């Protein structure tokens, strides 16, 4: 079964009406993945024997029997979880991440784990031990990263929704490149327990889907307190679907000058068109400045790489994961296991982070980056004193070609320039389709105050209802 023209509501109705059984839905989903994925390589693991939960309550649980894709850095009990790395290629977890436990309680069906950049470090899903994922709109283009597998699986109609993780744009950039919706909630809105750590002060699990409402339905389930994660907020979780279908009259919309100056030509026109839609509907558009935008890339890569170098110390060839053969002593085990188990990009970030944290460089690099991060947060706080939401482009350009930027790390890192700030500030941010640029999707980024995902959904839904981009079929999937 292909989901290009389906959503959670339509599938829920078919299940309630008996038009299809949950068992058949799972089987058809796996069958379609096997066929479609020959083109795009969106999956690392597919569960051939995927089965729905028992005693499904379709009326109570919107997600009951609905197949959901899971990014392969989210722990799943009894299902291989690799983070797209050689070092974890045979890792079989014995527990579920909190988000998985919550989805199981909601009776969702799990069909497999999606491809990604190794340990979520990348912007193209080319840095994977399991090969690159291709963009369903153009099979010679990247799907973005690091949640490129989840994005491609949704865009190609393999599933209606998928979980991803976002450390510097890893949900929003792939969402933009693939013409789907993707949301990174506020830091602390969703438990990170069971998410394989990259940058612990930046990581956040989120949702990707073709329709805005589908992400709202999934976020309703996975958000909220968790005794296993001390960083999760105790704030009450609203019904995010209640923010849909509203108008935007009187909404104060900030448009950062620095973001619009980063794009030109068709990309700028596509973004401006969506801003004009909001203006014509009665929103108040205000040009603003985020003066520290020029520092976000170096700040992020120092902070994220430093946290990564610490988090990845646990992969040593001893406790679990890949262990090198023909080693002479304990040091040899450490060195060879990590050298052979990690890919080039992961090793690059570990080295960068280790240097930034070293005694001679700490004050000049990590401490300075932490101080600049505070200034970036203050920029956003100031804007939100007089505005309800910030909008602008998600990326500076549409999807680039496979192999085009992989040998140029600096160029690859700059792909994140418009998305990183939301992670540094811990605010909710999403990307919603804004049209086509050179035949490839472009995304409008929407950001709001901490724990105000509702306004993000409100604006995204308004844009979606206006342009109906979800009706388009990815050109790479056309027969």
Curated annotation (Swiss-Prot):
Any one annotated GO CC term: glutamyl-tRNA(Gln) amidotransferase complex
Alphabetic keyword roster: ATP-binding, Ligase, Nucleotide-binding, Protein biosynthesis
Superkingdom of origin organism: Bacteria
Pfam families according to UniProt: Amidase
EC number(s) given by UniProt: 6.3.5.7
Molecular function GO labels: ATP binding; glutaminyl-tRNA synthase (glutamine-hydrolyzing) activity
Family from the record: Belongs to the amidase family. GatA subfamily.
Keyword Ion transport assigned: no
Subunit structure comment from the entry: Heterotrimer of A, B and C subunits.
Top EC class, one word: ligase
Natural source organism: Lactobacillus gasseri (strain ATCC 33323 / DSM 20243 / BCRC 14619 / CIP 102991 / JCM 1131 / KCTC 3163 / NCIMB 11718 / NCTC 13722 / AM63)
Name the record gives this protein: Glutamyl-tRNA(Gln) amidotransferase subunit A
Substrates-to-products reaction catalysed: L-glutamyl-tRNA(Gln) + L-glutamine + ATP + H2O = L-glutaminyl-tRNA(Gln) + L-glutamate + ADP + phosphate + H(+)
Stretches of the chain forming a coiled coil according to its record: none
InterPro entries: Amidase, Amidase_CS, Amidase_dom, AS_sf, GatA
Residues at the catalytic site: 71 (charge relay system), 146 (charge relay system), 170 (acyl-ester intermediate)
Record's function text: Allows the formation of correctly charged Gln-tRNA(Gln) through the transamidation of misacylated Glu-tRNA(Gln) in organisms which lack glutaminyl-tRNA synthetase. The reaction takes place in the presence of glutamine and ATP through an activated gamma-phospho-Glu-tRNA(Gln).
An individual GO BP term: translation
Keyword Protein transport set for record: no
């Amino acid at each position: 079964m292909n989901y290009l023209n389906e959503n959670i509501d339509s599938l829920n109705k078919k299940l309630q009406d008996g038009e299809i059984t949950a068992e058949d839905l799972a089987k058809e989903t796996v069958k379609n993945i096997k066929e479609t994925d020959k083109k795009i390589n969106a999956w690392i693991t597919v569960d051939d024997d995927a089965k729905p939960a028992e005693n499904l309550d379709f009326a109570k649980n919107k997600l009951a029997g609905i197949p959901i894709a899971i990014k392969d850095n989210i722990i799943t009990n009894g299902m291989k979880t690799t983070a797209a790395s050689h070092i974890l290629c045979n890792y079989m977890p014995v527990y579920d991440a909190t988000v998985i436990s919550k989805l199981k309680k909601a009776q969702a069906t799990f069909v497999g784990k999606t491809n990604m950049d190794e340990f979520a470090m990348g912007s193209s899903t080319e840095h994977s031990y399991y090969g690159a994922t291709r963009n369903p709109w153009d099979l010679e283009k990247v799907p973005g990263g690091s949640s490129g597998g989840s994005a491609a699986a949704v865009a190609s109609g393999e599933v209606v929704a998928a979980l991803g993780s976002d450390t510097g744009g890893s949900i929003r950039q792939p969402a933009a490149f693939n013409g789907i919706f993707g949301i990174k909630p506020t830091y602390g809105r969703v438990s990170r327990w069971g998410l394989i750590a990259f940058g612990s002060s930046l990581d956040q699990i989120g949702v990707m889907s073709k329709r805005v409402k589908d992400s709202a339905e999934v976020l309703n389930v996975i958000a909220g307190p968790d005794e296993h994660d001390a960083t999760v907020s105790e704030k009450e979780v609203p019904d995010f679907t209640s923010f849909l279908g509203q108008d935007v009259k009187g909404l104060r919309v900030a448009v950062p000058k620095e973001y619009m100056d980063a794009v030109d030509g068709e990309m700028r026109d596509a973004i401006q068109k969506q801003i004009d839609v909001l203006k014509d509907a009665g929103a108040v558009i205000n040009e603003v400045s985020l003066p520290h935008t020029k520092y976000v890339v170096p700040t992020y890569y120092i902070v994220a790489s430093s946290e990564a170098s610490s988090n990845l110390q646990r992969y040593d060839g001893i406790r679990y994961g890949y262990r090198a053969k023909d080693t002479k002593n304990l040091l040899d085990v450490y060195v060879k296991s990590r050298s052979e188990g990690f890919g080039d990009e992961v090793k690059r970030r570990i080295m960068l982070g280790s240097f930034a944290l070293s005694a001679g460089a700490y004050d000049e690099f990590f401490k300075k980056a932490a101080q600049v991060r505070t200034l970036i947060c203050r920029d956003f706080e100031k804007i939100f004193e007089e505005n309800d939401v910030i909008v602008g482009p998600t990326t500076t350009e549409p999807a680039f070609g496979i192999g085009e930027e992989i040998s140029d790390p600096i160029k690859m890192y700059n792909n994140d320039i418009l998305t990183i700030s939301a992670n540094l500030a811990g605010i909710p941010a999403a990307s919603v389709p804004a049209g086509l640029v050179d035949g490839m999707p472009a995304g409008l980024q929407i950001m709001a105050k901490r724990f105000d995902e509702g306004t993000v959904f409100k604006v995204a839904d308004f844009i979606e209802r206006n342009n109906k981009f979800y009706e388009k079929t990815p050109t790479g999937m056309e027969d």
